[in-house]
Amino acid sequence: MAEAEDSPGEQEAAASKPLFAGLSDVSISQDIPIEGEITIPSRARAQEHDSSTLNESIRRTIMRDLKAVGRKFMHVLYPRKSNALLRDWDLWGPLILCVTLALMLQKSSIDGKNDGGGPEFAEVFVIIWFGAVTITLNSKLLGGNISFFQSLCVLGYCILPLNIAMLICRLLLLAGQGPINFMIRLFVVLLMFAWSVVASTAFLADSQPPNRKALAVYPVFLFYFVISWMILTFTP
């Protein structure tokens, strides 16, 4: 049965009643807190921090990047299982180490017909970066969960011990060549070679499947061995 319609008198009374007439009886309790804080999510804070770097000076930017590179050097010199190189990766440190090592391995020549050892610089540069790219691709094919540039960052920074070995060998060669000198250089190169391998595997060990770690470590061993051999056989 359909509901009965309102009479004309009731409709006129409802129309004449104010719209907010009942709100005057509503009271707000004093116990209800009406103050609060506006929180900014961490991601929004990170974006705000990134945008604030656009306004900083060039000197401050360079110093900040150099400090970050220095901290990563310390992680390599004191290797331990850490995600520092993987989380805050960069290619400035590997580029600096690669250029420095290539310059120290470059032979100088006073013969005008030679180009001063330019191909040797290019050879070292290509070997380092081509080897790092090959190891990274091998890691990805084996099912590693590390990104391409993270792997390049770790492999590049772990050349630091070999740079130290090259510097020591050049200083030893200033005293002349001989069997004792060669044995000292051999010991230094082997020590720094082991240091580079241990440091790189400490950062990359957890990124590979447990049953394929040996297949991932072997190219790393070969990569640093080739660089160590170039350092050991260097003659000014």
From Swiss-Prot:
Modified residues (N-acetylalanine): 2
Chain coiled-coil ranges: none
Source organism (scientific name): Mus musculus (Mouse)
Origin: domain of life: Eukaryota
Family recorded in the similarity comment: Belongs to the YIP1 family.
Lipid bilayer topology: Multi-pass membrane protein
Residues that span the membrane, as ranges: 85-105, 117-137, 148-168, 186-206, 214-234
Transferase recorded as keyword: no
GO cellular component labels: cis-Golgi network; COPII-coated ER to Golgi transport vesicle; endoplasmic reticulum; Golgi medial cisterna; Golgi membrane; Golgi trans cisterna; trans-Golgi network
Entry's Gene Ontology BP terms: endoplasmic reticulum to Golgi vesicle-mediated transport; intestinal epithelial cell development
Pfam families: Yip1
Gene (name only): Yipf6
Chain ranges on the Lumenal side, renumbered to this chain: 106-116, 169-185, 235-236
GO molecular-function term, one example from the UniProt record: identical protein binding
Keywords: Acetylation, Golgi apparatus, Membrane, Phosphoprotein, Transmembrane, Transmembrane helix
Entries under InterPro entries matching the protein: Yip1/4-like, Yip1_dom
PANTHER family: GOLGI MEMBRANE PROTEIN YIP1, PROTEIN YIPF6
Function: May be required for stable YIPF1 and YIPF2 protein expression.
Designated name of the protein: Protein YIPF6
Subunit-level organization: Predominantly interacts with YIPF1 or YIPF2, but may also form a ternary complex with YIPF1 and YIPF2. This interaction may stabilize YIPF1 and YIPF2.
